[in-house]
């Protein structure tokens, strides 16, 4: 190899880690993951190409997720789990001082509370009592962008409201057993009122959704519950959550979302996708796609130990971040979809080694960092989010890959990639509870 190439090493683990530059990749008896199967059960229509879809770097931002979850766990009503405008202003001021200087330039809402379309609007104007317009203006005044948790396949307004640019009513987009072929006829959608975008006016409905948020100044849409829309059945809940509108409707609807998001300059974050057929749709039409189940309580369990080494053919394919990044690493890279490891709650981790690990694997994989610690809980964990040496990977749009994307293989613990200046970054990740040796021959990576 070229002796002029520069290398930097990250040694990350729960315990001390040695990294001599020689090759050793014994399997330790770990078992391989199962690749996703082709789960398409209906014909997918001819779909558009969306040029220059993957031009973004992974976002660095703060999410209200932890606050919502902990308020809900404490028994608060859903509308009290959402920040008021005054609470958001306090958070934005804290962001401006503590995270914005390090590249975290966005905040994002999440899924608790009531989504309201007021004053005849077809689309959400208020999140519980939070006026989105004023919220975005307050953020913009501080140099901070806003992401909104919403989905163009959800209905928040009255049925008699007209779809923008058409004479169709929003109610005409609802499931119609006379024309919609679904997986479980008669099953109602839970939690959300669903629009079926393949009905007449559906394309205009989706385009109007993204125009609405563009006009408000929103930068990202976090689009959730994709697997419930496509399949109707949840493997985790072990129950039907909706009729399941099928692969063809999902594919066409997602393609339209991508077209409109690109048209209006909105970053499209896909959440809870099945990723069937090797993520052929999500990798094509999402700027970013989730590769692991929900953060929930955080901790090392979410990052590494939960169902370690196991994978499934539908959402979620993996139940911990490290496996998710490994499993889906082959679809990521510069000019490709961004892998999303969900929210980070550093205050839930047991020690500094764990905190270093969770930040490092996300940045090594080219993923975002979505800080979710509350101001009252973040404490000394803040410094791990402010690590300029690690954040340089994000600024450079670095995307690394494991030596081996087989779950629990020795090679899956060694990640590497190149910076734009030609230097190599190598990360050694120890997922075990005791020190261990890792070795790498530099010729292996270039």
Set out the residue ranges of the language-model regions.
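Active-site-proximal substrate-binding groove within the catalytic cores of carbohydrate-active enzymes
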Residues: 57-63, 258-446
